[in-house]
């Protein structure tokens, strides 16, 4: 099932996601829906908060990219970055911040401890685009967006686009969720 993507103003994207205690039928269904939603939106990574679920879960598939055709799709549960190496500045975008790109500096390689789709613990080193996509999606699980990592002067340059997204003045080829945030006692949805 294709799920709507939350936009950057949605509260769930600014919260620390909760760890999963296992994989049951509901989580399996969510994983399948996340892959379907990511593919429908022409994305290469998607975190559970981006579809409204505050869970430490992400999926990615970079096999559509040149030089990464042999990289298998991944399910990453409860990730924890153990170590990082190097630095790399690269332009990023995000399904939750449609139409906006910006330069973000990240480590060029990471050692990651996580659980896979079968909830088996894995520890692996990742580099290049795979490391970047993993870090971008893991940020979502901590309530951080790529725009939060941009230099302030660069962020000011995209403020109009961010305002348009907040107002719903955007067109995308995938479903978007209504953004909701808390204000005092009630929810405000835009």
Swiss-Prot record:
Looking up HAMAP family in the UniProt record yields: Pep_deformylase
The opening ranks of the lineage are: Bacteria, Pseudomonadati, Chlorobiota, Chlorobiia, Chlorobiales
Stored NCBIfam families: pept_deformyl, PRK00150.1-3
Its job: Removes the formyl group from the N-terminal Met of newly synthesized proteins. Requires at least a dipeptide for an efficient rate of reaction. N-terminal L-methionine is a prerequisite for activity but the enzyme has broad specificity at other positions.
Q: Which cofactors? A: Fe(2+)
EC code(s) of this entry: 3.5.1.88
Q: What residues form the catalytic site here?
A: 137
InterPro entries tied to this protein: Peptide_deformylase, Peptide_deformylase_sf
Q: How cofactor binds (record note)? A: Binds 1 Fe(2+) ion.
Task: State where Fe cation binds.
Answer: 94, 136, 140
Protein name, UniProt field: Peptide deformylase
Question: What is the reaction catalyzed?
Answer: N-terminal N-formyl-L-methionyl-[peptide] + H2O = N-terminal L-methionyl-[peptide] + formate
Its source organism is Chlorobium phaeovibrioides (strain DSM 265 / 1930) (Prosthecochloris vibrioformis (strain DSM 265))
């Amino acid at each position: 099932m294709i799920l709507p993507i939350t936009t950057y103003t949605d509260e769930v994207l600014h919260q620390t996601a909760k760890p999963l205690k296992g994989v049951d039928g509901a989580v399996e269904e969510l994983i399948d829906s996340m892959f379907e939603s990511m593919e429908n939106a022409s994305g290469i990574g998607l975190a559970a908060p981006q579809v409204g679920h505050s869970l430490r879960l992400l999926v990615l598939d970079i096999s559509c990219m040149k030089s990464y055709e042999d990289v298998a799709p991944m399910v990453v549960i409860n990730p924890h970055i153990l170590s990082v190496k190097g630095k790399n500045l690269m332009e990023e975008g995000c399904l939750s911040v449609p139409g906006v790109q910006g330069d973000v500096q990240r480590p060029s390689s990471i050692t990651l401890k996580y659980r896979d789709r079968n909830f088996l613990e894995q520890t692996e080193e990742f580099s290049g685009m795979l490391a970047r996509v993993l870090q971008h999606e893991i940020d979502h699980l901590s309530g951080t967006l790529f725009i939060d990592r941009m230099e302030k002067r660069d962020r000011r340059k995209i403020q109009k686009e961010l305002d348009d997204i907040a107002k719903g003045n955007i067109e995308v080829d995938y479903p978007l969720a209504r953004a909701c945030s808390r204000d005092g006692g009630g929810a405000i949805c835009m």
